[in-house]
């Protein structure tokens, strides 16, 4: 019988297999940040162990980093301590670190791919659930806990139970104005936040194949929001073109050999998945969340659902609780929901294509009165590229705040937070209660919807904008 993409990569990395025990996998790339690594390094110190493979380990600062005044001391003592601890640990153990202010600093899941560290057929781990992002390259990538971080640092291996596989096939072409973020939000709403539990998801089909690498990263990034262990997309010419010439990509004959191997990383025709889901791309539309988990979403053209419409008691209760927290009413049109803040950034949508898309919509327009718009590049390198294209000027002229790289408002661990009761349209990946700050209310959206929302002041898509939203040039 043939094998799926996930099975091929898994089998290639098994160091030891024994009946009744988890497989022991070799890890090709270990990414670190300041939040989940301190106890792991402490464990190494206590046991007197070094980092096993410094050449396969890299760290960056992202979760706690400020996005303003990065040359000044960090005010919050916890954030400052975590960053200082990471710097000391990396110095003590010889781990490569890209700290705040470094040209390669940024959100770990943006930094890895842009450096060419993430490659097809590799295993990638990080103490962060959105490590699934790297599966866009045909890598087997998953988040791990702190004790597992220590295990990988010490041994470059990890014992893991083999997950099941699920194919998510997206047939046809995405309609105009529908993005990768809309697609993954629709998938999560379809299968639920627990629908992928115990599975590695493989995204397939015409719509997936036509996505750029950055769009594919958005898809795989949110696999964890469907409960999955990982998400993967088979590598192809789009993948190879993205990787070629990047700092850590193979060169010359090594490149040719790598591409030949990468081309084998496709699910065999006779392979069998444990589960399959089919999505019709033509039926999709701009999508937003209305509740407090990523599965509570609907097309922007819809209304807030009535909890009474849910047959399942637990779903009904969750919807009731979500509406109470979000301050919404059943039947309320999603487009009528006013926002206070718009956030463009994160490891989901903080790449250059995302910033270009948002900038194109706010160009020659103004952010609505009473709305605050934060634009945060996913890495310092992305920020430099955006500046070279003049995108920072576009955002600032529209009235948005242009920031330095970091996780920013994706989570309430740095100064960029919502105040209690404030509502945001956010391109990040989670909308749990308090995720963006205590009492904050989050609607997950695409960069395009975020930008249109910033201009109109309520949830909106670019199609809702008209020529009337463009200021008349002086003297005309």
Curated annotation (Swiss-Prot):
Keyword terms of this UniProt record: 4Fe-4S, Amino-acid biosynthesis, Branched-chain amino acid biosynthesis, Iron, Iron-sulfur, Leucine biosynthesis, Lyase, Metal-binding
UniProt-listed Gene3D superfamilies: Aconitase, domain 3
Region feature (Disordered): 418-442
Coiled coil regions, renumbered to chain: none
Taxonomic superkingdom: Bacteria
One GO MF term attached to the UniProt entry: 4 iron, 4 sulfur cluster binding
Cofactor binding annotation: Binds 1 [4Fe-4S] cluster per subunit.
EC number: 4.2.1.33
Pathway the protein takes part in: Amino-acid biosynthesis; L-leucine biosynthesis; L-leucine from 3-methyl-2-oxobutanoate: step 2/4
Binding site for [4Fe-4S] cluster: 347, 407, 410
Catalytic reactions of this protein: (2R,3S)-3-isopropylmalate = (2S)-2-isopropylmalate
GO term, biological process aspect, one: L-leucine biosynthetic process
InterPro entries named among the record's database cross-references: 3-IsopropMal_deHydase_lsu (IPR004430), Acnase/IPM_dHydase_lsu_aba_1/3 (IPR015931), Acoase/IPM_deHydtase_lsu_aba (IPR001030), Aconitase_4Fe-4S_BS (IPR018136), Aconitase_4Fe-4S_dom (IPR036008), IPM_dehydratase_rel_enz (IPR050067), IPMI_cat (IPR033941)
Function: Catalyzes the isomerization between 2-isopropylmalate and 3-isopropylmalate, via the formation of 2-isopropylmaleate.
Subunit structure: Heterodimer of LeuC and LeuD.
Listed name of the protein: 3-isopropylmalate dehydratase large subunit
């Amino acid at each position: 019988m043939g094998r799926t993409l996930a099975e091929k990569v898994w089998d290639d990395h098994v160091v030891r297999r024994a009946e009744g025990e988890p497989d022991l996998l070799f890890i090709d790339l270990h990414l670190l940040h300041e939040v989940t690594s301190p106890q792991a390094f402490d464990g190494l110190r206590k046991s007197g162990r070094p980092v096993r493979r410094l050449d396969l380990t890299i760290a960056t600062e992202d979760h706690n980093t400020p996005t303003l005044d990065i040359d000044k001391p960090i005010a919050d003592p916890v954030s400052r301590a975590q960053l200082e601890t990471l710097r000391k640990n990396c110095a003590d153990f010889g781990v490569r670190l890209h700290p705040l202010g470094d040209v390669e600093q940024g959100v770990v899941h943006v930094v890895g791919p842009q450096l060419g560290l993430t490659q097809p057929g590799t295993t990638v781990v990080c103490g962060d659930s959105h490590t699934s992002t790297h599966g866009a390259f045909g890598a087997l990538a998953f988040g791990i806990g702190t004790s597992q971080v220590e295990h990988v640092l010490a041994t470059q291996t990890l014992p893991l139970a083999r997950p099941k596989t699920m194919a998510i096939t997206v047939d046809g072409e995405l309609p105009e104005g529908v993005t990768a973020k809309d697609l993954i939000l629709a998938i999560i709403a379809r299968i639920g936040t627990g629908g992928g539990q115990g599975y590695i998801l493989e995204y397939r089909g015409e719509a997936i194949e036509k996505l750029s690498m950055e769009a594919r990263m958005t898809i795989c990034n949110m696999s964890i929001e469907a409960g999955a262990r990982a998400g993967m997309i088979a590598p192809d010419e789009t993948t190879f073109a993205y990787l070629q010439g990047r700092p850590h990509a193979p060169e010359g004959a090594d490149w040719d050999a790598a591409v030949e191997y990468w081309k084998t990383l496709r699910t065999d025709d006779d392979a069998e998945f444990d589960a399959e889901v089919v999505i019709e791309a033509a039926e999709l539309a701009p999508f937003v969340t209305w509740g407090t988990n990523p599965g509570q979403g609907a097309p922007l053209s819809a209304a807030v659902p009535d909890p009474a419409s849910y047959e399942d008691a637990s779903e009904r209760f969750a919807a009731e609780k979500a509406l109470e927290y979000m301050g919404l009413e059943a039947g309320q049109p999603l487009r009528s929901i006013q926002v206070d803040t718009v956030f463009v950034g994160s490891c989901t949508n903080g790449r250059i294509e995302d910033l270009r898309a948002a900038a194109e919509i706010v160009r020659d327009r103004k952010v609505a009165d009473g709305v605050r718009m934060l634009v945060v590049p996913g890495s310092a390198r992305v920020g430099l590229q955006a500046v070279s294209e003049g995108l920072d000027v576009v955002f600032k002229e529209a009235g948005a705040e242009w920031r330095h790289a970091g996780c920013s408002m994706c989570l309430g661990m740095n100064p960029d937070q919502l105040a209690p009761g404030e509502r945001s349209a956010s391109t990040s990946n989670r909308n749990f209660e308090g995720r963006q700050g205590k009492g904050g209310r989050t609607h997950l959206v695409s960069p395009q919807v975020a930008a249109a929302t910033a201009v109109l002041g309520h949830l909106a898509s670019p199609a809702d904008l008209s020529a009337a939203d463009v200021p008349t040039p002086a003297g005309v």
